[in-house]
Every structure is written in structure tokens, then in C-alpha cells.
Amino acid sequence: MAPQQPQPTSQDWDVEFNQVRREKLFRDPPTDRTAYPALQAAVDPHIESFNALFRDDGKPSLLDHALAEIGTKTFLDGDERADPQGKNKLTIRYKSIELQKSQVPPTNRWAKNREIFPAECRERHVSYRGKLSATFEYRINDGEPHEFVRELGQMPIMVKSNKCHLQNNSPAQLVARKEESEELGGYFIVNGIEKLIRMLLVNRRNFPLAIVRPSFQNRGASYTPYGIIMRSVRPDETSQTNVLHYLSDGNVTFRFSWRKNEYLIPVMMIMKALVETNDREIFEGLVGPPQSKGVANTFLTDRVELLLRTYKKYGLYSKTQTRAYLGQKFRVVLGVPDTMSDYEVGTEFLRKIVLVHLGSQDVTEQQDADKFNMLLFMCRKLYALVAGDCAVDNPDAVQNQEILLGGFLYGQIIKERLEELLTVSFRASLRDYLRRNPTVSFQSDTFLKDFPIAIFRRANENIGQSLEYFLSTGNLVSPSGLDLQQVSGFTVVAEKLNFLRFISHFRMVHRGSFFAQLKTTTVRKLLPESWGFLCPVHTPDGSPCGLLNHLAHKCKIMTESVDASTISRLAFELGVVNISSAATSESVVVMLDGRIVGWCTPEECKSIAETLRYWKVNGENGVPLQLEIGYVPPSNGGSYPGLYMSSQPARMVRPVKYLPLQKEDFVGPQEQPYMSIACTEQEVIPGDSTHVEFDPTNILSILANMTPFSDFNQSPRNMYQCQMGKQTMGTPATALAHRTDNKMYRLQTGQTPVVRAPLHNTYGFDNFPNGMNAVVAVISYTGYDMDDAMILNKSAHERGFGHGSIYKTKKVSLKDDSRTRSAKSIVKMFGFAPNSTIRESTRDMLDNDGLPRVGRLLREGDVICAWHTVSADYNGQLVNRDGVTHYERYKDSEDAFVEEVRVIGADNGTEPLQTVSIKLRIPRSPVIGDKFSSRHGQKGVLSQKWPATDMPFSETGIQPDVIINPHAFPSRMTIGMFVESLAGKAGALHGLAQDSTPFKFDEQNTAGDYFGHQLMKAGYNYHGNEPLYSGITGEEFQADIYIGVVYYQRLRHMVNDKYQVRTTGPVVPTTGQPIKGRKKGGGIRVGEMERDALLAHGTSFLLQDRLLNCSDYSKSWMCRQCGSFLSTQPTVSPFIGKRKAVSTVRCRNCAVRLDDMEDVDLMQIDGEIWEDGSGTQWIGGENTTIVAVPGALKYLDVELAAMGIKLKYKVDKKDEIRRGQLVGKKAGDLMLTA
């Protein structure tokens, strides 16, 4: 009998608990495939975009396209300034690029298994990378081609990509390799930290966007705000933005940016250079044939006439003339070799810059004609925009955007680095070589011996290092700027705070750091176009609000082109022609991937779109399912009509049901605004609706779907929950033993929620529990629950409610950064120095190897490891000579346990131990001041652990775990929490997992009714209320109390991490105020609210203590007369002799210099003569006093004086110097007489 085949893992999930099945999957991970395909699909865009760089399926990869784009570079020998004729020519190009999987370096002779897995890189705090190498091909004077290979450094590899050892591993294999059973991948590991390239929203590719920007007027005289922008994308995913500007005299200029410089060219010159054409052809191309309606449009014909007339001044008519003219102007800009003629440079300019999506490698005449037609269409749309016949395209709408994927951006950086290596580094080292050896030609034996090794060695070949820098900092160092609006903020740390946080990173889409600084809020608005593509709920509050969005959970991103080769033929069969008119009522454009296929009437256009869609869904005639068919109908001043089809990558698509065939169709953001898609089956309008949503929750992100009954809540509360779900102290990972994160939070007593959406199981969130089911009573009890505080049952706390731990990793390295690489220069080693005296307490803490014992409790000041200095003796052995043992100590104030000690070896395996990584566990039981929240944005602080004996109890003997105040609900309108409480109670009584998917209930079929009947069946009150008895008096409460089961989350904001105490400590040198920062022992800030509270309490004198005495109290001399700090100075008494001691302080401003007084009798002088430090003598200025002022005030005074502003203070007269005699009037009444 044949052995039974293993059954494939079932991937279907429902809303039930499924605990046994989940536990089996966890204990015996499947050996065939994942049980949670939806979870793996969430990360697909990241992995697939990286895989596109190095394909192994025979199709050309993105880097193959990039190498073809870089092309062949030419170098000449001899004198640089001499004429190129008669010189030898060296041509060199990249033939291929190879990336190896991660391996131990060849210098390591000890390793048996040479593969390096990601888990090892995390634990060793190093980067997960492979060797990058390039094969070059060169010829001398068109001779035989020769090849050589150069290594380009170590390049970071994306986890689970096609260059990673974990690709296509089953869950069982992943567990064996120390990963999660459901390891997602999609990130890089740099220095042991998981880094992710975030997805960015950019302009839609190959589509002319009509925009109005007031800043366009600043480009020069007669420029207007009108323009057409086209972000044109090459096959290797690099882009070049082309802009057409409308000038007030009817002219149009073509603008582009090259290596961060902008250039403007008349659009007529580009057209004349592309094809051999004449004025009539251009006129008819813009306006239409003589008999068409477009000719009647005088607005258009007048401007086209001006466009043609003003170009006459250049005197360039033929294609050859125009290309040579462009080549002459752009020769230096493009950096082309001297051997190229002006005409060839012009051709190169058109290839590299003008509408590159229509041909950027070996451009044919047909492709040039396509570029010409596209420019005509862009001019036509620009004139329509100016005339008001077409609306402005909104660049902030998802309809006009696409996503720049991490892998594609990574590929763009690799391409640019490869090009820089040839055009900059290699060119410089070759030039340097030729200068040092002026007599050597490319054909000489000396050169053939030195090339390529001696010349390439001087070039900076380490591309891997610059990629690692990009990933670790997120900063882009690029000479071209890669056609992006930002240079930083491209990468984020994929934090595993909890699993929800981790998965959200991969679905995050950012608008770009440039928009974060804008003062306008238009870019942040939630627009209806993003329905089903971007989640309307899941965006942070605060500064990134609306800029950092998350993809809806069903939204997919295309990572490769679909085959649209039959579309052009089908379009012509359906009635598309080549003749067009400027009047959109007569003809509209049919475009595929930014190439004009042809033109047709608006009526034909609609039927072509409907026919293609039917074929597409039915899989007929080779129309791919993921093709986007963006039909824009004609309108009165609306969007420019046409049929815009797209088959290229980086598009968002989402599944909906196509009603005529009842099959799945994928729609894109450009076609959706003009389609009729019903939300539910009941809303389908016969004869109008073409599609219906599979599920109304498809518009929400993964995390927003986890909020139970979110349709019952006020919208901001759902947004808050999306943030708080990501700040929960949950279960970050199951492979905790193989992670060395700087800080990791873990909840020890996690539970599966009773109330949850079916997606909770689909995504396998039960493997990473995020909270606990708590019995919650809504009652105002004891007053400790005011202002969102919550009371916790002390017994629940003792049973482990919310108990968690923090894991911290401390790395101790003895390596000295300045030391060289040879092993002989090791100067420190772990362990005790021989013959040194060691305390008994230290012996208890450390083992004989000088490392801490696992499981030991550490307190502040305890030793965590011992080391001693070493040097090599005459045998090369490392010995200690001074007999002194040095210790590293634990500096944190919190007690911790040593969880794990890792000894980390060197790459080559020959060095003694130099680095250890110690993981510490800090238990964190909930204490007063820790933050908790329900799944409805109802956050609160634990205010008291109330003894169980004093807690209220129900008739069935149930005591609540948590008590919250009823005032938390009315203003916040979180009705979802009431429903969850009912559902959780019913679910707990019947042993059911309750489905909390939103939009399930309506006015006829209410949630209260549904769950109320379940409660009645269990013998409880229909409304969820119960009579409770006071735990203190034992009497029944006057009112019934609402009590049920709610899933509670413990947030990571704990009072132990936040409390701040300070008496005296470091101050800011300039102001004298306490520094800020808890770590540095800084002060606690008293702001305006605190000030108002103290004033309201009638304790205003406390304010003086807080804001002056405890802050920057200082005593300072001041002149009463002129009211200034700045003019006072200490005097020097002239009679003390050589010591010249400082005596009193005088005001220099009010005093008179003795030398400036004429005929003065020293005996008659009224006042004291005093001397300053330089020996000058003065009289007067003694009206000074000491005042108490804040140090910051003196600093402000000096700063303002530097700007020429003088501050004058009035001093209270209470302590003025008394002069004259005292005359008594009445007893006890004193009066001052002058």
C-alpha cells in the first residue's frame, strides 16, 4: 500500500475559537505551507518588489534593464585637452550583476555550515548581507571583448526574498531556523536592527496631470500658473518628470530637472527634434483636420499660430539641425564622451530625458513618433486647461497617485551607485593613472597589465556600504535626487512592540516628509477617491495625521506588469482610429501605459471600455484581469475625457464583484471614481450599478477591522484605538529566545478575545495575544475612578491580570574602535586577571569566565562582567601583566534578572571573545499609574488596587475585575463598548466566540436585541444590568449596574518609565534653569496649566518658590538710577596697596570719570572716588542695590542689548539708602528727611 500523502494545511478560518487547531499548528508547525495566507500576503509588495531586482525565472530583471540603461561608457587616452582624433578608445560596460546569498567569509576556516541565517544576524547585532559582484566587458578600439569580475562589497538582503535562505521555507523549517513559524520577511537587518523601507505616494506614472500652481509664475517673465506634469518611468523603475508650462503669450515651454538643475526648452524644439515634421502637421496635430470642429476654436488656433510663429527666430527646421543644436547645448550637461557628434548627443538627450517611458534604450523611429504624439496631446490638454474646458487634476487624490515600493527604490539607488562607479570613480582613477603615466597608451603592455586591477583598486567600489548607510539612516545621498521631493526619512525601524504594530509597518503608506512641513491642510484631507484603497480610520493623530495612511486590507499593489500586448490590436478592431480633433465632443484619446493607441468618438469610447471589461473579467482575448481600464466620460469642464489603460507595476488594485458575470474583478483608483459600485447587495441599482463590494469592511485596514463594532462608535475613538492597539504591551514574537531587541515588552497573561472579527483568525492574531478579557462594571464607586481612572480588583491583579515583563539587551564590547584588524592588537579579554583579589560578593555574581550567571538578580551598582588587559608575549600568547581586574556595572535603578548571556565571536572565527550580549528581564506587574485601555479608545490610568473583600459583587457571586466611571461614555459616544460588554457576557456564558464585524446590524435588526436574547437564554437580564451588592455594607445598590466582559489592553506607558524626581542637579549654563530630560536627572516642567491651578488654589506664593527659588534664583547688582544690570561693575579700593581687593559695586553709567572733570578740588567732592580694574578713577554711581531675579532674565537682557534694545527696570523704593536725620513725630512713627 502506498504511503498516505500528507494533507495540505487547511487555510480556511471562521470566527470560532479554534483553540485546539491553533495549538496543534503552534506545536507542530505545518511542513507544507502556511495556515495564514492572508498574513503572508500583507507583506507581498515589499518582498516582490525586491525580487524584481534579481529575477530567476528567465525574464529580464529590473537590474538588467538598469544595466542596459547605463549603457557603454567610452574613455580616451593621451592628453585630455588634445583633439579626440587619433586617440585610442576604451569602451566598458556592465555585463551582469550577481548577488550571493549570505555566507561566512572565506577567511573563516572553522565553520562547517557556511550559510548565515537572519536569526544569527539579529543575535550577533550584525547586518544580513550577501556579496555583490559585477561582470564588466571592455574593448580597446572596437577589438575583441574581454571580461573581468569585481566585487562591490556586501549588500543588505531583504528577509524572505529570493536572495534569502528563508525563501519558500515551510513553517516547520522556519522554526528550525530560529524564526517565527509565520515569519513575514519584507525587512532588512542592519546591525541587528530590523529596518523597513517605507512605501511612498508619488504622482501616477505616464499620465499627463493638469495642475495649477501659483509658484510656476516665478519661473520667469510671462509664465502663468498653468502646467502639465508627466512623471515618466523607465523600464528599470527610475523616473524623469517632464513639465509643460503655458506662457501668457500662448507659448509652451518644456521643463525638466537633471542632476538637481532645471532647464527650460521651447516645446517646438523638442517636437522638431523628435520627428521630421512641418508646421502644418503640428497645427493639425494640435487642432485637428481642416474640416473638424477643433478648427472653429479660435482660442486654440490663435495660440497655436503664435506658438509656430515665435519658433521661427531659432531658424531650425529639420530634425538633423535641431538635434545637433540640442546636442551642442547639452553636451557638457550630459557628460558624454568627446567622440560623439552633436547630432548623437541630441539623440542621447531625447533618449535620456524626453518622455522616457516611450523609449529609453535603442529608441526606434516609431518610439520617437509616439513621443511626438504624446507631446501634441499634452499641449492640447494644456490649452484646454487654460481655456477652462478641462478641470485641474488633484495631485492629492489617490486617483492620480501610485506607490513607490521599497524594492524599486532600493534598485534605483543600486543603479545610480553603479553608474557613479563608472562615470565618476573609475573616470577619476583612470585620469589619475594617465596623468602619472603620460606616455602609456591603451594598447601598450603596461596598461594591459595594470588594467583593470590597478585602476579599479583606486576607485571606491564599495556599493554595499552606501546601501547599508541608506538603510540605517534613511538618508539618500544622490547626485540626481532620484526625481523625489525628499532626501531623508525613507526607512523606519520595524518595531516589534507587539504584533499589531509590526504588521502595520508593512501596510503603511507615507505621503513624504516634504508634505509634513507644509502649512496647508489640503494634503491631509480624506478624499472619497481613496475608498477601498486607503483606510479612512487608521491614521495617527497629531503632526503625521492624514500623511501617514495605511492600505485597506484587501488592497493589493501590483509589482510587475501584466501582459497587455493584445490591447492595441483589440482597440483598433473595436473602432479606434489615428485621426483626431481638438474638440472632445468629436474625438477622445485611447491610451495604454502612457502611449497613445488612437482616437475614437465618446460613444465608441464607452462601449470599448465596457467590452474590454467584460473580456477582462471573463478571461477572453488575452485581456489580463489586473488591467486598469480608466474610462473618463466627456463632461462640461470636468476631467479631460478619454480611455486611460494601465498594465504597469506600482498600481493599487482591489477586488470587487462584477455583476454581469458574478465574478471577481480588480479595479484601480483611476477607474473607480467613474464607476458605479454598490456597497451592499441591497444598494444595487438595476441598470446603473456594474459592481458590488464583496464586504463593506473591505475599506478598513487590518488593524481597523480588529476594533469590535466600530460602526457604533464616534469616529475619533476608532482612530485612537488604531494607535493604542499598536502601543499595547502584547506578545511581540514567539521566538523570544532568539531576539535581542534593545527593549521588548511582553504580556505574560494574554488571552484570546471573546468578541472578535473573523479576520482575527484569518491573520492568526491568536498566536500573539494582546490583552485580557475583564469583567467590567460601570459604576461610580469610591471616587478613585474620576477622570478616566479605573479601579482594579486586587485579587485579579494577584491572579496575574495584566502582568508583563520588559526585556532589555545590553551589549558589552571590549573592542577598541581605533585598533587595527590583526589579532595581535587585542588589548582586553573577559575573565578575572590571574592573582587578583576578588570579593566574595563578586564571585557570587559572576562565573569563572567573568560573565554573569543566568537567573541572577541584579541591583544598581552590581557587577555584570569582569575583564582584564592583555598583551602578547614572545610566543604570541595573550597574557595579563598587571593583575588588575576591571568590572562593568549595572547602572539602572530598576532590579532585573539575567535572562540570557550570548557570547559573540568574530566573523573569521580566530579572535578570542571580545563581545557579549546580555539580555535582562525586568518584571512589571501593574502598579498605580499604569495605563490601560479598552478596544474603543477608552484609555485610563490604574488608580487603586481595591481589596476583593470591599469590591461589589453580583447575585451569582461575580466580582468585577475592573470598575470604570459612567462619565466615560456620554461625551465620547463609544456605544461599541456597551455592545462589546453585552456580547462578551453572552459569549462567556454560552462558550461562544462572538462576531464583532461592523455593519452587521441595522435599525430593524439591532445588536441589543441579538445579544439581549442570548443573555435571557442564560437567565440574565436582557439589558445587561444586574443588581450588585456593596462589598463594604453588604446592601444592594439602589440602581442596577451595567456589567459585562470587555477585552482590556495594557499599554506600554508605565509609571516606572515616566516618574521623575529632582531636588538639585545639572542646569543649563546659559539660563541657570534645570536641564530637561528624565535620563539626565532634569527638572519637572511647570507649565501654564499648573500655574493656573496653583493660582486657583490661592497658593500664589508657591509659584514664586517653584518658578524662581527652585529654578534659576540668582542675586544680581542693579543701578537704581538707570535701572540696568549691565552698567554695574565691582570697584577696586586704591588704598589697600598691591593686593587691590574688590570692595563694592558701582554703576559706571551714572558715575563720572575723574580725568574728565576740570579744576576739581578733591576735598570738595561729594561722593567717593573709586577705581575700576584698569586703574581708571571715577566719582559717583553708588546708587546700586542687590535684587533677586531669575537667571534667564539677565540672559535675555544681554541678548536684547546685543540687538541694540535696552531694558530699564524700576526698583522698589523700600530698601533705598536712607539720608538725613530721623525726626520722631509720634511714638513708633519714623519719617525720612532728605
Swiss-Prot record:
Subcellular location(s) per record: Nucleus, Nucleolus
Gene Ontology CC annotations of this record: mitochondrion; RNA polymerase I complex
Keywords: DNA-directed RNA polymerase, Metal-binding, Nucleotidyltransferase, Nucleus, Transcription, Transferase, Zinc, Zinc-finger
GO molecular function: DNA binding; DNA-directed RNA polymerase activity; ribonucleoside binding; zinc ion binding
Similarity section: Belongs to the RNA polymerase beta chain family.
Quaternary structure note: Component of the RNA polymerase I (Pol I) complex consisting of 14 subunits.
Identification of the protein by name: DNA-directed RNA polymerase I subunit RPA2
Protein's organism: Neurospora crassa (strain ATCC 24698 / 74-OR23-1A / CBS 708.71 / DSM 1257 / FGSC 987)
